[in-house]
Protein backbone atom coordinates (compact mmCIF):
# COMPACT_ATOMS: atom_id res chain seq x y z
CA UNK A 1 0.00 0.00 0.00
CA UNK A 2 1.23 3.53 -0.83
CA UNK A 3 4.35 2.37 -2.61
CA UNK A 4 7.18 4.59 -3.76
CA UNK A 5 9.32 3.69 -6.75
CA UNK A 6 12.89 4.90 -6.33
CA UNK A 7 15.11 5.84 -9.29
CA UNK A 8 18.75 6.80 -9.02
CA UNK A 9 20.66 8.22 -11.98
CA UNK A 10 24.26 9.13 -12.70
CA UNK A 11 27.24 8.79 -10.39
CA UNK A 12 26.02 11.11 -7.67
CA UNK A 13 22.47 9.76 -7.71
CA UNK A 14 23.66 6.18 -7.50
CA UNK A 15 25.99 6.87 -4.61
CA UNK A 16 23.35 8.74 -2.61
CA UNK A 17 20.82 6.08 -3.52
CA UNK A 18 23.07 3.24 -2.41
CA UNK A 19 23.57 4.97 0.94
CA UNK A 20 19.83 5.55 1.24
CA UNK A 21 19.11 1.85 0.80
CA UNK A 22 21.66 1.03 3.51
CA UNK A 23 19.84 3.37 5.91
CA UNK A 24 16.34 2.16 5.00
CA UNK A 25 17.34 -1.51 5.15
CA UNK A 26 18.86 -0.91 8.55
CA UNK A 27 15.62 0.68 9.77
CA UNK A 28 13.52 -2.21 8.51
CA UNK A 29 15.89 -4.92 9.71
CA UNK A 30 16.83 -6.15 6.25
CA UNK A 31 20.32 -7.59 5.89
CA UNK A 32 22.45 -7.28 2.70
CA UNK A 33 20.99 -10.49 1.27
CA UNK A 34 17.43 -9.19 1.56
CA UNK A 35 16.53 -11.42 4.51
CA UNK A 36 14.59 -9.98 7.42
CA UNK A 37 16.48 -10.23 10.70
CA UNK A 38 14.82 -7.50 12.75
CA UNK A 39 13.14 -7.71 16.12
CA UNK A 40 9.87 -5.80 15.76
CA UNK A 41 6.67 -6.39 13.81
CA UNK A 42 6.51 -2.68 13.09
CA UNK A 43 9.48 -3.05 10.76
CA UNK A 44 7.50 -5.39 8.54
CA UNK A 45 4.10 -3.78 8.83
CA UNK A 46 4.53 -1.42 5.90
CA UNK A 47 7.78 -2.63 4.47
CA UNK A 48 6.18 -2.83 1.04
CA UNK A 49 6.38 0.95 0.62
CA UNK A 50 9.97 0.50 -0.57
CA UNK A 51 10.34 -3.28 -0.96
CA UNK A 52 8.83 -6.09 -2.97
CA UNK A 53 8.61 -9.43 -1.25
CA UNK A 54 10.14 -12.04 -3.53
CA UNK A 55 10.12 -15.82 -3.27
CA UNK A 56 11.73 -17.30 -0.19
CA UNK A 57 10.83 -14.26 1.89
CA UNK A 58 13.53 -12.05 0.40
CA UNK A 59 12.87 -8.33 0.24
CA UNK A 60 13.91 -6.54 -2.93
CA UNK A 61 14.04 -2.74 -3.18
CA UNK A 62 11.71 -1.04 -5.65
CA UNK A 63 14.78 0.68 -7.00
CA UNK A 64 15.89 1.38 -10.54
CA UNK A 65 19.54 2.20 -11.09
CA UNK A 66 20.50 3.97 -14.29
CA UNK A 67 23.72 5.39 -15.63
CA UNK A 68 25.37 5.94 -18.98
CA UNK A 69 28.57 4.19 -17.95
CA UNK A 70 29.04 0.98 -16.02
CA UNK A 71 31.58 2.26 -13.45
CA UNK A 72 29.36 3.46 -10.62
CA UNK A 73 26.96 0.56 -11.03
CA UNK A 74 29.83 -1.87 -10.58
CA UNK A 75 30.88 -0.19 -7.37
CA UNK A 76 27.28 -0.20 -6.09
CA UNK A 77 27.06 -3.87 -6.94
CA UNK A 78 30.32 -4.51 -5.11
CA UNK A 79 29.22 -2.34 -2.17
CA UNK A 80 27.79 -3.61 1.13
CA UNK A 81 24.18 -3.84 -0.10
CA UNK A 82 24.94 -4.52 -3.76
CA UNK A 83 23.34 -7.96 -3.77
CA UNK A 84 20.07 -6.52 -2.47
CA UNK A 85 18.97 -5.00 -5.78
CA UNK A 86 17.17 -6.82 -8.52
CA UNK A 87 19.77 -7.50 -11.25
CA UNK A 88 17.34 -6.58 -14.07
CA UNK A 89 16.94 -3.13 -12.57
CA UNK A 90 20.49 -2.06 -13.37
CA UNK A 91 20.18 -0.19 -16.66
CA UNK A 92 23.38 1.25 -18.04
CA UNK A 93 25.09 2.32 -21.24
CA UNK A 94 28.77 2.13 -22.09
CA UNK A 95 29.63 5.55 -23.47
CA UNK A 96 29.06 7.96 -20.58
CA UNK A 97 27.59 11.44 -20.87
CA UNK A 98 30.86 13.24 -20.27
CA UNK A 99 29.28 15.92 -18.06
CA UNK A 100 27.27 17.01 -21.07
CA UNK A 101 23.57 17.66 -20.44
CA UNK A 102 22.76 17.34 -24.14
CA UNK A 103 24.26 13.85 -24.27
CA UNK A 104 22.17 12.79 -21.29
CA UNK A 105 18.96 14.40 -22.52
CA UNK A 106 19.04 14.13 -26.30
CA UNK A 107 21.55 11.63 -27.63
CA UNK A 108 23.06 8.92 -25.40
CA UNK A 109 20.36 9.15 -22.73
CA UNK A 110 17.53 9.13 -25.24
CA UNK A 111 18.77 5.79 -26.61
CA UNK A 112 18.76 4.20 -23.17
CA UNK A 113 15.60 5.81 -21.80
CA UNK A 114 13.17 3.25 -23.22
CA UNK A 115 14.81 0.37 -21.41
CA UNK A 116 14.69 2.43 -18.19
CA UNK A 117 10.99 3.15 -18.75
CA UNK A 118 10.31 -0.56 -19.23
CA UNK A 119 11.77 -1.26 -15.80
CA UNK A 120 9.83 1.67 -14.31
CA UNK A 121 6.59 0.28 -15.75
CA UNK A 122 7.37 -3.16 -14.41
CA UNK A 123 7.97 -1.75 -10.92
CA UNK A 124 4.87 0.45 -11.09
CA UNK A 125 2.72 -2.50 -12.15
CA UNK A 126 3.91 -4.43 -9.11
CA UNK A 127 2.42 -1.77 -6.84
CA UNK A 128 -0.98 -1.88 -5.15
CA UNK A 129 -1.46 1.83 -4.96
CA UNK A 130 1.52 3.77 -6.25
CA UNK A 131 2.09 6.96 -4.28
CA UNK A 132 4.80 8.37 -6.50
CA UNK A 133 8.41 8.37 -7.58
CA UNK A 134 11.50 9.60 -5.82
CA UNK A 135 14.60 10.35 -7.84
CA UNK A 136 18.14 11.00 -6.65
CA UNK A 137 20.45 12.78 -9.06
CA UNK A 138 22.83 15.70 -9.36
CA UNK A 139 22.31 18.68 -11.62
CA UNK A 140 25.94 19.41 -12.39
CA UNK A 141 26.91 16.37 -14.43
CA UNK A 142 25.52 14.89 -17.63
CA UNK A 143 23.60 11.73 -16.77
CA UNK A 144 21.83 12.70 -13.55
CA UNK A 145 20.91 16.09 -14.93
CA UNK A 146 20.22 15.39 -18.61
CA UNK A 147 18.92 11.86 -18.49
CA UNK A 148 17.38 12.37 -15.05
CA UNK A 149 15.20 15.22 -16.31
CA UNK A 150 14.38 13.27 -19.47
CA UNK A 151 13.15 10.39 -17.31
CA UNK A 152 11.14 12.76 -15.12
CA UNK A 153 9.34 14.23 -18.12
CA UNK A 154 8.62 10.78 -19.61
CA UNK A 155 7.33 9.39 -16.30
CA UNK A 156 5.29 12.55 -15.88
CA UNK A 157 3.61 11.89 -19.24
CA UNK A 158 2.77 8.33 -18.29
CA UNK A 159 1.78 8.86 -14.63
CA UNK A 160 0.49 12.45 -14.55
CA UNK A 161 -1.38 12.08 -11.24
CA UNK A 162 1.47 10.54 -9.23
CA UNK A 163 3.80 12.59 -7.06
CA UNK A 164 7.25 13.24 -8.51
CA UNK A 165 9.77 13.99 -5.80
CA UNK A 166 13.43 14.58 -6.50
CA UNK A 167 16.52 14.88 -4.32
CA UNK A 168 18.69 17.10 -6.48
CA UNK A 169 22.30 17.94 -5.72
CA UNK A 170 22.91 21.47 -6.98
CA UNK A 171 26.35 22.82 -7.89
CA UNK A 172 28.04 24.36 -4.86
CA UNK A 173 29.14 27.99 -4.77
CA UNK A 174 32.82 27.36 -4.03
CA UNK A 175 33.34 23.68 -4.77
CA UNK A 176 33.01 22.91 -8.45
CA UNK A 177 33.48 19.50 -10.03
CA UNK A 178 32.87 20.57 -13.59
CA UNK A 179 33.33 23.80 -15.51
CA UNK A 180 30.02 23.44 -17.35
CA UNK A 181 27.97 22.90 -14.16
CA UNK A 182 26.06 26.20 -14.57
CA UNK A 183 24.86 25.12 -18.03
CA UNK A 184 23.81 21.65 -16.91
CA UNK A 185 22.10 22.95 -13.77
CA UNK A 186 20.19 25.72 -15.54
CA UNK A 187 18.95 23.38 -18.25
CA UNK A 188 17.85 20.93 -15.53
CA UNK A 189 16.03 23.52 -13.43
CA UNK A 190 14.20 24.52 -16.61
CA UNK A 191 12.81 20.95 -16.64
CA UNK A 192 12.29 20.53 -12.89
CA UNK A 193 10.17 23.67 -12.65
CA UNK A 194 7.71 22.18 -15.12
CA UNK A 195 7.76 18.46 -14.34
CA UNK A 196 8.52 17.83 -10.66
CA UNK A 197 6.14 18.21 -7.71
CA UNK A 198 8.73 18.65 -5.01
CA UNK A 199 12.48 19.15 -5.32
CA UNK A 200 14.62 18.79 -2.20
CA UNK A 201 17.66 20.93 -2.83
CA UNK A 202 20.99 19.65 -1.55
CA UNK A 203 24.45 20.94 -2.13
CA UNK A 204 27.86 19.60 -1.30
CA UNK A 205 29.27 22.73 0.22
CA UNK A 206 26.55 22.92 2.86
CA UNK A 207 27.07 19.23 3.58
CA UNK A 208 30.83 19.78 3.93
CA UNK A 209 30.15 22.64 6.34
CA UNK A 210 27.92 20.41 8.45
CA UNK A 211 30.65 17.76 8.51
CA UNK A 212 33.38 20.24 9.50
CA UNK A 213 31.49 22.46 11.91
CA UNK A 214 28.88 20.31 13.54
CA UNK A 215 30.25 16.81 13.24
CA UNK A 216 33.89 17.89 13.67
CA UNK A 217 35.10 15.53 10.95
CA UNK A 218 38.54 16.53 9.70
CA UNK A 219 38.39 14.79 6.32
CA UNK A 220 34.78 14.21 5.29
CA UNK A 221 34.28 11.77 2.43
CA UNK A 222 31.37 11.55 0.01
CA UNK A 223 30.21 8.64 2.17
CA UNK A 224 29.76 11.04 5.09
CA UNK A 225 27.92 13.56 2.92
CA UNK A 226 25.62 10.92 1.49
CA UNK A 227 24.92 9.63 4.99
CA UNK A 228 23.51 13.05 5.89
CA UNK A 229 21.35 13.15 2.78
CA UNK A 230 19.99 9.67 3.35
CA UNK A 231 19.07 10.53 6.94
CA UNK A 232 16.89 13.33 5.61
CA UNK A 233 15.49 11.12 2.83
CA UNK A 234 14.49 8.47 5.31
CA UNK A 235 12.82 11.13 7.46
CA UNK A 236 10.66 12.42 4.62
CA UNK A 237 9.07 9.02 4.07
CA UNK A 238 9.05 7.65 7.63
CA UNK A 239 5.34 8.35 8.08
CA UNK A 240 4.53 6.05 5.21
CA UNK A 241 6.68 3.28 6.59
CA UNK A 242 5.95 3.36 10.31
CA UNK A 243 2.78 4.07 12.27
CA UNK A 244 2.52 7.54 13.74
CA UNK A 245 0.24 9.82 15.68
CA UNK A 246 0.14 12.38 12.90
CA UNK A 247 0.84 11.03 9.46
CA UNK A 248 2.10 12.75 6.38
CA UNK A 249 2.94 11.42 2.94
CA UNK A 250 4.41 12.83 -0.27
CA UNK A 251 1.11 14.26 -1.45
CA UNK A 252 0.28 15.87 1.89
CA UNK A 253 3.76 17.32 1.89
CA UNK A 254 3.24 18.80 -1.57
CA UNK A 255 -0.20 20.17 -0.73
CA UNK A 256 1.06 21.83 2.43
CA UNK A 257 4.34 23.15 1.07
CA UNK A 258 3.64 24.39 -2.45
CA UNK A 259 1.61 27.61 -2.44
CA UNK A 260 2.31 28.35 -6.13
CA UNK A 261 2.99 25.55 -8.59
CA UNK A 262 6.41 26.74 -9.74
CA UNK A 263 7.79 27.35 -6.26
CA UNK A 264 8.46 23.79 -5.22
CA UNK A 265 12.16 23.88 -4.35
CA UNK A 266 12.71 23.04 -0.68
CA UNK A 267 15.47 23.41 1.86
CA UNK A 268 15.94 20.29 3.94
CA UNK A 269 17.48 19.92 7.35
CA UNK A 270 17.89 17.18 9.89
CA UNK A 271 18.41 17.17 13.64
CA UNK A 272 20.13 15.98 15.76
CA UNK A 273 23.20 15.84 13.56
CA UNK A 274 25.53 13.03 14.51
CA UNK A 275 28.53 11.64 12.70
CA UNK A 276 28.42 8.07 11.53
CA UNK A 277 30.59 6.65 14.29
CA UNK A 278 29.55 8.58 17.37
CA UNK A 279 25.90 8.22 18.16
CA UNK A 280 24.69 10.82 20.58
CA UNK A 281 24.68 9.77 24.19
CA UNK A 282 22.08 12.17 25.47
CA UNK A 283 18.55 12.41 24.18
CA UNK A 284 17.53 15.83 22.93
CA UNK A 285 14.31 17.43 24.05
CA UNK A 286 11.68 18.66 21.62
CA UNK A 287 12.63 22.35 22.18
CA UNK A 288 16.29 21.57 21.46
CA UNK A 289 15.38 19.63 18.32
CA UNK A 290 13.18 22.47 17.12
CA UNK A 291 15.89 25.01 17.75
CA UNK A 292 18.53 22.95 15.96
CA UNK A 293 16.22 22.21 13.07
CA UNK A 294 15.67 25.89 12.25
CA UNK A 295 19.35 26.67 12.57
CA UNK A 296 20.83 27.86 9.28
CA UNK A 297 23.87 25.63 9.90
CA UNK A 298 21.62 22.58 9.67
CA UNK A 299 20.36 23.28 6.16
CA UNK A 300 21.68 20.94 3.51
CA UNK A 301 21.90 23.65 0.92
CA UNK A 302 23.94 26.84 0.90
CA UNK A 303 21.06 29.30 1.23
CA UNK A 304 20.62 31.14 4.48
CA UNK A 305 16.94 31.10 5.50
CA UNK A 306 17.53 34.36 7.39
CA UNK A 307 18.00 36.11 4.05
CA UNK A 308 14.45 35.30 3.00
CA UNK A 309 11.10 34.33 4.43
CA UNK A 310 9.42 30.98 4.80
CA UNK A 311 6.33 30.59 2.64
CA UNK A 312 5.66 27.22 4.28
CA UNK A 313 7.53 24.63 6.29
CA UNK A 314 7.02 21.11 7.51
CA UNK A 315 8.60 19.20 10.37
CA UNK A 316 8.53 15.44 10.65
CA UNK A 317 9.30 14.35 14.16
CA UNK A 318 10.28 10.78 14.97
CA UNK A 319 10.30 9.09 18.35
CA UNK A 320 8.21 9.01 21.50
CA UNK A 321 7.09 12.54 22.30
CA UNK A 322 3.94 14.43 23.12
CA UNK A 323 2.23 15.99 20.13
CA UNK A 324 1.13 18.82 22.39
CA UNK A 325 4.76 19.72 23.03
CA UNK A 326 5.50 19.56 19.31
CA UNK A 327 2.62 21.92 18.53
CA UNK A 328 3.68 24.32 21.27
CA UNK A 329 7.26 24.44 20.01
CA UNK A 330 6.13 25.02 16.44
CA UNK A 331 3.92 27.92 17.52
CA UNK A 332 6.70 29.22 19.67
CA UNK A 333 9.12 29.33 16.71
CA UNK A 334 6.55 31.10 14.55
CA UNK A 335 5.72 33.69 17.19
CA UNK A 336 9.31 34.50 18.08
CA UNK A 337 10.48 34.72 14.47
CA UNK A 338 7.31 35.97 12.86
CA UNK A 339 9.27 38.27 10.55
CA UNK A 340 10.75 35.19 8.86
CA UNK A 341 7.34 33.75 7.96
CA UNK A 342 5.08 35.39 5.39
CA UNK A 343 2.03 36.73 7.19
CA UNK A 344 -0.36 36.10 4.30
CA UNK A 345 -0.24 32.35 4.93
CA UNK A 346 -1.37 31.92 8.54
CA UNK A 347 -0.25 28.74 10.34
CA UNK A 348 2.20 27.90 7.60
CA UNK A 349 3.92 25.14 9.58
CA UNK A 350 2.87 21.54 9.16
CA UNK A 351 4.10 18.93 11.60
CA UNK A 352 3.82 15.18 11.73
CA UNK A 353 4.89 12.70 14.37
CA UNK A 354 6.06 9.16 13.71
CA UNK A 355 6.57 6.87 16.70
CA UNK A 356 9.63 4.97 15.52
CA UNK A 357 12.92 6.89 15.73
CA UNK A 358 15.85 6.16 13.39
CA UNK A 359 18.48 3.62 14.45
CA UNK A 360 20.53 4.76 17.41
CA UNK A 361 18.53 7.90 18.25
CA UNK A 362 15.75 8.48 20.79
CA UNK A 363 14.10 11.18 18.71
CA UNK A 364 14.90 13.11 15.57
CA UNK A 365 13.28 15.57 13.23
CA UNK A 366 13.43 16.15 9.48
CA UNK A 367 12.72 19.65 8.34
CA UNK A 368 11.47 20.64 4.89
CA UNK A 369 11.02 24.33 4.24
CA UNK A 370 9.86 26.38 1.29
CA UNK A 371 11.86 29.55 1.77
CA UNK A 372 12.33 32.47 -0.61
CA UNK A 373 16.01 32.43 0.37
CA UNK A 374 16.57 29.61 -2.07
CA UNK A 375 16.60 32.22 -4.80
CA UNK A 376 20.20 32.98 -3.74
CA UNK A 377 21.15 29.61 -5.10
CA UNK A 378 19.39 30.10 -8.42
CA UNK A 379 20.80 33.59 -8.72
CA UNK A 380 24.31 32.31 -8.20
CA UNK A 381 23.99 29.61 -10.84
CA UNK A 382 22.30 32.06 -13.17
CA UNK A 383 25.15 34.57 -12.86
CA UNK A 384 27.71 31.90 -13.68
CA UNK A 385 25.56 30.75 -16.58
CA UNK A 386 25.28 34.27 -17.99
CA UNK A 387 29.00 34.90 -17.69
CA UNK A 388 29.80 31.90 -19.87
CA UNK A 389 26.83 32.10 -22.19
CA UNK A 390 27.53 35.72 -23.09
CA UNK A 391 30.81 34.56 -24.61
CA UNK A 392 29.24 31.33 -25.91
CA UNK A 393 31.93 29.40 -24.05
CA UNK A 394 31.72 25.59 -24.30
CA UNK A 395 28.55 25.91 -26.34
CA UNK A 396 29.82 23.76 -29.21
CA UNK A 397 29.68 20.67 -27.00
CA UNK A 398 25.93 21.17 -26.70
CA UNK A 399 25.11 22.35 -30.21
CA UNK A 400 27.18 19.43 -31.52
CA UNK A 401 24.62 17.10 -29.92
CA UNK A 402 21.84 18.89 -31.79
CA UNK A 403 20.83 21.50 -29.23
CA UNK A 404 19.79 24.99 -30.21
CA UNK A 405 20.98 28.21 -28.59
CA UNK A 406 17.31 29.12 -28.17
CA UNK A 407 16.98 26.41 -25.57
CA UNK A 408 19.74 28.00 -23.51
CA UNK A 409 18.08 31.39 -23.72
CA UNK A 410 14.75 29.92 -22.65
CA UNK A 411 16.29 28.07 -19.72
CA UNK A 412 18.09 31.22 -18.65
CA UNK A 413 14.94 33.35 -18.67
CA UNK A 414 12.95 30.62 -16.91
CA UNK A 415 15.52 30.58 -14.12
CA UNK A 416 15.44 34.38 -13.87
CA UNK A 417 11.64 34.34 -13.74
CA UNK A 418 11.84 31.85 -10.89
CA UNK A 419 14.16 34.16 -8.95
CA UNK A 420 11.88 37.14 -9.43
CA UNK A 421 8.82 35.12 -8.41
CA UNK A 422 10.52 34.21 -5.14
CA UNK A 423 11.50 37.85 -4.67
CA UNK A 424 7.97 39.05 -5.38
CA UNK A 425 6.48 36.83 -2.67
CA UNK A 426 9.27 37.67 -0.25
CA UNK A 427 8.40 41.37 -0.48
CA UNK A 428 4.65 40.81 -0.45
CA UNK A 429 2.66 41.80 2.62
CA UNK A 430 -0.90 40.93 3.53
CA UNK A 431 -2.09 44.47 2.74
CA UNK A 432 -1.08 44.42 -0.93
CA UNK A 433 -3.57 41.73 -1.82
CA UNK A 434 -5.45 43.88 -4.35
CA UNK A 435 -2.38 44.86 -6.34
CA UNK A 436 -1.42 41.21 -6.57
CA UNK A 437 -4.67 40.19 -8.13
CA UNK A 438 -4.33 42.84 -10.80
CA UNK A 439 -0.78 41.75 -11.59
CA UNK A 440 -1.83 38.13 -11.70
CA UNK A 441 -4.64 39.14 -14.04
CA UNK A 442 -2.24 40.91 -16.37
CA UNK A 443 0.17 38.00 -16.24
CA UNK A 444 -2.67 35.63 -17.01
CA UNK A 445 -3.63 37.74 -20.00
CA UNK A 446 -0.07 37.68 -21.30
CA UNK A 447 0.15 33.94 -20.87
CA UNK A 448 -3.15 33.55 -22.66
CA UNK A 449 -1.87 35.69 -25.51
Curated annotation (Swiss-Prot):
Any GO BP annotation: microtubule-based process
GO cellular component: cytoplasm; microtubule
SMART domains: Tubulin, Tubulin_C
Origin superkingdom: Eukaryota
Main localization, broad class: cytoplasm
Acidic residues: bias regions: 429-449
Region feature (Disordered): 426-449
Keyword entries, A-Z: Cytoplasm, Cytoskeleton, GTP-binding, Magnesium, Metal-binding, Microtubule, Nucleotide-binding
Positions with a binding annotation for GTP: 11, 69, 138, 142-144, 204, 226
Record has Transcription regulation as a keyword: no
Residue sites binding Mg(2+) per the record: 69
Function noted in UniProt: Tubulin is the major constituent of microtubules, a cylinder consisting of laterally associated linear protofilaments composed of alpha- and beta-tubulin heterodimers. Microtubules grow by the addition of GTP-tubulin dimers to the microtubule end, where a stabilizing cap forms. Below the cap, tubulin dimers are in GDP-bound state, owing to GTPase activity of alpha-tubulin.
Protein name from the UniProt record: Tubulin beta chain
Source organism phylogeny: Eukaryota, Sar, Alveolata, Apicomplexa, Conoidasida
